[in-house]
Amino acid sequence: MDLASVNGEIPGIGRDEKLLLVCVRGKRGYFLQNRMKYYGYKNTVVLEGATSFNDVKVKNAQAAVPPAEVTRVKGLGFLFDKRTQDRFNGRVITRNGKITAEESRAIAQAAELYGSGEIAMTSRLTVEIQGVPFDNIEPLREFLAQNGLETGGTGSKVRPVVSCKGTTCQYGLIDTFALSEEIHEKFYHGYHDVKLPHKFKIAVGGCPNNCVKPDLNDLGIIGQRIPQVDLEKCRGCKVCQVENTCPIKVAKVRDGKVVIDDSICNHCGRCVGKCPFKAVEAHQDGYRVYIGGRWGKKVAQGKYLDKVFTTKEEVLNVVEKAILLFLSLIHISEPTRLDVIS
């Protein structure tokens, strides 16, 4: 029985009848049992892990999906579940890991109607609907589209953009939500039909805390706050609040004045505003861009570009140039990091 068809009284089945629910996987049987209970069917029992009971057969049980179809739906964001022969896990795109309550309800309803009822998060912050039968893939996609959602996030393309919560976090130096959403529209959607040499991952971090590991992505962006010291206002205090605040200890009082070593400062901005005499009030906000990061079987930290960019437009331009550079390597079969050829 299709869960989606249980929307009230079931024709031909009385609410007081005793019913045996036979299911290859017990989970769906229990979801159906709960759904039927909601509509007044309270005399039900679930038989787990069975394909038949007497003359009752489970439709399409263990029907294998052709390899060509497995490949095709993978391109739509549905990955084959190795525990089964006809179930897939579908990835719902979230833009940057942030969804509305309405979208969340739609995803939960889709999981119940077309999947196993389970939902998981991926490392790229997409929402994965588990246990979708092959025949339910297109109905699921149509249902999601009606609610402004889409599946995807697979293949040798620009992958879903990830972002930390820098927009709301106390340490965030840039609006990570706005920037990642713009990157999502311009490059995830804008380059959706462009086949790259390998998947291309982008991450946006609000500060040097690196919570989403931007430097381990093909391209990473990290918010920056570059402090500017007014030496005339510095009194060389024995207990310097700027020095005490610096988490990586690159601010030091030398010869009666505070000095910040810019060559090793990570521009977290924690020291800005901490001097009671306002010696470190001025600052420049910006974006540091890393290229060539990688994680997986092999791990490599990306290298940052020397320039700290001060406008969003500059950053978007760099992102596009990096993707185009990556695209120029389409003839190379071996996955290549950008920093290797930059």
How should these model regions be labeled?
Residues 63-87:
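Intrinsically disordered, low-complexity polar/charged tails and linkers
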Residues 65, 90-239, 263-264:
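Small-residue-enriched alpha-helical segments and adjacent helix-cap loops
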Residues 79-84, 115-121, 252:
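Short, flexible, solvent-exposed loop/turn segments with mixed acidic/basic and small polar residues
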Residues 330-341:
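Single conserved hydrophobic/aromatic residue that forms the stacking wall/gate
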Residues 1-63:
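Rhodanese-like catalytic fold shared by cysteine-dependent sulfurtransferases
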Residues 239-260, 270-286:
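Iron-sulfur cluster-binding cysteine motifs and their immediate structural context
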Residues 78-82, 218-223, 287-295:
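Short beta-strand elements
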Residues 285, 294-329:
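A hydrophobic, small-residue-rich beta->alpha segment in the mid-to-C-terminal subdomain
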